[in-house]
UniProtKB/Swiss-Prot annotation:
GO molecular function: N-acetyltransferase activity
Annotated segments matching region Interaction with HYPK: 500-865
Sites bearing N6-acetyllysine, chain numbering: 262, 734, 755
Compartments, as annotated in UniProt: Cytoplasm; Nucleus; Cytoplasm, Perinuclear region
Protein purpose: Auxillary subunit of N-terminal acetyltransferase complexes which display alpha (N-terminal) acetyltransferase (NAT) activity. The NAT activity may be important for vascular, hematopoietic and neuronal growth and development. Required to control retinal neovascularization in adult ocular endothelial cells. In complex with XRCC6 and XRCC5 (Ku80), up-regulates transcription from the osteocalcin promoter.
Stretches for region Disordered: 579-642
Basic and acidic residues compositional bias, start-end: 579-594, 606-621
Keyword Transcription regulation included in the entry's annotation: yes
Protein name: N-alpha-acetyltransferase 15, NatA auxiliary subunit
Tissue: Endothelial cells, osteoblasts and myeloid cells of the hematopoietic tissue. Present in adult ovary, bone marrow, brain, heart, kidney, testis and osteoblasts.
Amino acid sequence: MPAVSLPPKENALFKRILRCYEHKQYRNGLKFCKQILSNPKFAEHGETLAMKGLTLNCLGKKEEAYELVRRGLRNDLKSHVCWHVYGLLQRSDKKYDEAIKCYRNALKWDKDNLQILRDLSLLQIQMRDLEGYRETRYQLLQLRPAQRASWIGYAIAYHLLEDYEMAAKILEEFRKTQQTSPDKVDYEYSELLLYQNQVLREAGLYREALEHLCTYEKQICDKLAVEETKGELLLQLCRLEDAADVYRGLQERNPGNWAYYKGLEKALKPANMLERLKIYEEAWTKYPRGLVPRRLPLNFLSGEKFKECLDRFLRMNFSKGCPPVFNTLRSLYRDKEKVAIVEELVVGYETSLKSCRLFNPNDDGKEEPPTTLLWVQYYLAQHYDKIGQPSIALEYINTAIESTPTLIELFLVKAKIYKHAGNIKEAARWMDEAQALDTADRFINSKCAKYVLKANLIKEAEEMCSKFTREGTSAVENLNEMQCMWFQTECAQAYKAMNKFGEALKKCHEIERHFIEITDDQFDFHTYCMRKITLRSYVDLLKLEDVLRQHPFYFKAARIAIEIYLKLHDNPLTDENKEHEADTANMSDKELKKLRNKQRRAQKKAQIEEEKKNAEKEKQQRNQKKKKDDDDEEIGGPKEELIPEKLAKVETPLEEAIKFLTPLKNLVKNKIETHLFAFEIYFRKEKFLLMLQSVKRAFAIDSGHPWLHECMIRLFHSVCESKDLPETVRTVLKQEMNRLFGATNPKNFNETFLKRNSDSLPHRLSAAKMVYYLDSSSQKRAIELATTLDGSLTNRNLQTCMEVLEALCDGSLGDCKEAAEAYRASCHKLFPYALAFMPPGYEEDMKITVNGDSSAETEELANEI
């Protein structure tokens, strides 16, 4: 349909519609739209229909908005306004690629429209279409050469494309246009200079960067950044004496910064260990109270010199009462010789302080206060916990608690000892004791909630967190709103451990949504940062967003989700009782009766709580409805509700797992787990070439990894057993597998692996699993391989032994209940505190509430009687 042009009166109304939209006066805008469209001549005016649709979209009427905009577009396909509006609609729904197409169509009919070009550039940088972004910024520079955003945007485009020299030239041309007095302090100009210097450094133009820094030093506000950059540049240019002077100046500003000492070392280039130590001895004299110059030499010293320096360092810290001293020295624990020296010294302090209140009986000087002994015992508890001796660690921490029962740090360490020893319930109880000593401390509150979650006590953790969340809303909703991902990852892990897969997946998807929101949140900064000239931070933000899903929170959530989806594929939940059946199948009559009693009590308690919560929920929903509506309008519509039951009964669990896997394959390639999870998914999908690809990538990272060995055997065996593979696929597989396995068969390959790693328990477990996988008649040998607890084995730790017990129980080594019970008893002697190895009759009779209350489950006892 040909475009209809509006007469002056209606044209004036149309301009008022645009103004109303810009000022968010949507109701008024709709009135003016109605005035134009009510005239039969203009009832199908494309641009007015499009603007009406855009206005309705802002009021949350999405379907009607799309219908009107499309109708308007059909009536006027050559209108840049209609295409622009359609692009804005797509952008509001986060359909950025579609929005870019719309903007490009709009520019066909009005190629120099500034607003469309600006909107297009925002989407291009959001989607990292850097070539397109550069072209668009060039057009904007040509149209508005007087605007600084035009120059800066064009320079950033070249910077992101790694054409540093061109970016530096553009910035220099722009800088020349800035009229700034040398004596005037201008923050924005200062940031521009620092950004220009960053570009020069990234271009490798170190001499020019140093000259630039010296020329404009007075006009840069961030003096610390100037000095730090100057030090780096002088090192790059091998002007070592000047660099040393700069780093000495930086040390005076902050004697506690490790990087300045490293920089000074690089500048002075000590020839041997004594010269290196001399650098730090000079710093001791200059900064007698500084801990960093006393700590850093411990990294490279050894023998008597190490002992001498460590002695001085520890005495200073223990006398002052410095709680984090163990964390400061933790990195030294990789060296067994240094660990022995630490133990010798600190045990000696404890003995001497008990007898004569001195660090050494031969010392001359005043006696140490009683708190010094306390901090020595506090350190020793952490030391023995670190080296895997929880009984001795508990002796020291209990002695310390007896002497000072009000010090929170002692309870924190006691909780950690129990956690590392495998008794998370006892750990949670002691962390709760710590929290009860200071209920206003948010750190302790969060720590306690985390431990309670690790004990699978989700309700108690929510109660704990509710002390620091907004009133009037549930703690879980508020924590989700605040993107509190540590809580959600721990929740997901707890739900997974309890076989509540739907709830666990809900938490994983919530975390996934947080990362999507963080990615979308950068949109506002594309204009803000150019306006405020915070260019260094802006470029850092863009680089961070590109690798956002490398974050441990995302990796942990993705790992949990993938593991659950794999379980759901192997054992789909077809009805509500399936999980329950899996838990009760192997129970005795007595255990079953006990479980039923517990369930009845839980049901009764849940009903009472449900009634109490219903009234509270209604109030919360009323409070949140308006906020939720506002949020939905802002983010482009309500999100699909995450329903646990629906998530747990998904039809294509492997496809859902791939959604979590894809970002890991792109961004976390250096972690072997990424490729092994990929193998597990493709193995179930019978995608042989993708299985091979995953194995090869994992092999390149760690060819001796136990889990990788299992994957390789399963791949090898599957290829050998498969008869209906296409010839081309079989040819590729044969060629690549010859490189991986050589001329052998799966059984021989497994035996070779076992011989090569016979002294490693994790490797023995993997080999044992594959012995049974390849030949179920070899079960006895497989169990013997896995259950050996010889003291000479490496990695014979709590985690590995728990994995062996799990393999004995889950069928990986066949049906072997007697072997599992015997192994549990053996491990109980090795790890007496670990819950996983407690005797079958063992029950944790205490339940954790908030603020240290503990009570016996008397009702359960009554029912038993």
